[in-house]
C-alpha cells in the first residue's frame, strides 16, 4: 500500500516498508546505478556520462620516476662522478642524468646513474640505470645497465629520436649509442652529444630544428658492423628528411668505441655527407 505522504513515495507491505526508490530497487532486481540511469532517462535527464580514464601502470611509473629524479643529487662530487672519472670522463652531463645513492636490486642496495630518455615530443620514454658499487660497475653476474619502459608499447613503437639529452641542443649536435661514449665524444670534440642508448634508437633519430651539422659517433663493432650500419642508416634518413641540416659526419675509431679511444688512444675515420640543396 502506497502512503501519499511527503511526496517520497512512501509504502508499506507485509514484506517491509520504505520510500519509492527502495520499492523500485526491490521490484526491479537491478543495481542501484542502473536504476538511477533509467529514471534519469524517463524524466528527461539524459546526459552524456564521461568515463574517468583508468591510470595505466606506465603513467603511474612515469610519475614516480619523475618525482624521484627531482629529488636526486647532481653527479658532481658523488661516486657516480668517480665512476665516470675512472673511465677518463671529466666533462659531466649538464642534464638528464643524476646520482641515486640507494638503488635496490635483487635484495641488495647499490648506487646508480639515473638517466631519463625522451623523444622528439619531449615525452619521457625510458629510465636508463647503470648500477654501481662505489666507483665501479656493480658485479651482478649480468649487465649492470637497466632500461625500463615508461610508456605503453603502442606509443614506444612509434616514438622517434629517443635519447638521453645530456646537453642543450646546438647547431652542431652529436649522437652516440652509450652514455660513456657520448660523454667521451663531448670531451674530445667539445660537441654537445646525446646518447641514443642503442643502435635501434640511433636508426630512428632525427635532428631537431636548428641543427645544421649532425655528427654521429659510431661504435666500431668489429664482428658485426652494427654501429656503423646504424650510423649510416641514421645519416641517410636525416639527409632525406625535411630539416635545417647542411651536412652529416660519421666518425668511428679503428677499435671499439670513443670511450676506449679516450682511455687508450686510437685513429678515427670520418665520412662527410652534404645535403642536396633544394632547387629554387
Predicted regions and their residues:
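Non-catalytic accessory segments of DNA primases and related replication-initiation nucleases
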Residues: 1-86, 222
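A short mid-domain helix/strand-loop element embedded in enzyme catalytic domains
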Residues: 50-63, 71-82, 86-95, 118-135, ...
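TOPRIM fold recognition
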Residues: 11-14, 170-173, 179-280
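Terminal peptide-recognition signature
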Residues: 3, 13, 24, 84, ...
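Phosphate-handling DNA/RNA-contact segment within nucleic-acid enzymes
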Residues: 105-209
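Short, solvent-exposed polar/charged micro-motifs at secondary-structure junctions
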Residues: 1, 47, 103-108, 137-138, ...
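Short, basic/aromatic recognition patches
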Residues: 89-108
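Residue-level detector of short coil/turn "hinge" positions at structural boundaries
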Residues: 31-32, 91-92, 247, 268
